[in-house]
Amino acid sequence: MRHLFLLLASLLALPSTALATWSVVAVDRSTGRVVIASATCVNGDDQFLPGVQAVVVPGKGVAACQASVDGTHTNQMLVFNELQKGTDPKAIIELLSADPAFQSRQFGIVDLQGRRAGHSGLTNGYVAQDIQGQVPGTEVFYSIQGNILRPGEVVPNAVKAFLNAKGAITDRVMAAMEAADAGGGDSRCSCPPPAADAPAATIPCDGKTAHVAYILMAEKSDTNGDSHNNGKYTMFLRVAQPDKGANAIHEGENLNPVKTLRLRYDAWRKTQPASFR
């Protein structure tokens, strides 16, 4: 334990990445699926956001590590390793609290035992909020969180959409992402007029509240990698702005990445069998 405290204390002197965002993490005990989705106004490539934020342990649980993100990935690996051990998410938050920068972090953690926990640090940018719960009458559990959101009901609206959606757990997560987007999402970006010769000039932009977005689902039979999010997963859809990676937005899509994520999700959903629920 002393080694853990010393390791986390060292984070105080190491760089963090400021990552305003909203995210949805969820599990379905009846199918063993774990899902994470997120969007942010940080304009990185298509791997930047999931690369620093997502913690995925097939058959065990899922988490989002955001706000002032640990650039060393020590926090993310702590969550990854503890989920593999079966540690209660509330106990994982307690372990994370040893980090001197804990109050600048935001976490949402859910495991396949239905246990969940969240933390929004006191120095997270306004509006910052996290809500956990269970869909009544189901084995679906969730945590929805965000920071530097537009004033209003971004996270509560996402929760309502998640609860009211029908279909598979991924359908619920996608509905929650759209509700957060419609509620204003990340407060720092919008749709500025592009230059006439810019790659985005011929692509519509409707109510843009993020620059990048993704959704990832792991079946319980999927496998881990050697880090917290580089395993082999059944579904992983990413969206980035034009010229920002292999999954960049292109003509026929929308510069609002959540709208484009919906298009790509619907295309993927059509490939799934009728038994997918």
Task: Please place each PLM-identified region on the residue numbering.
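N-terminal nucleophile
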Residues: 19-277
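N-terminal secretory signal peptides that target proteins for export/translocation
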Residues: 1-2
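Bacterial N-terminal signal peptides
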Residues: 5-17
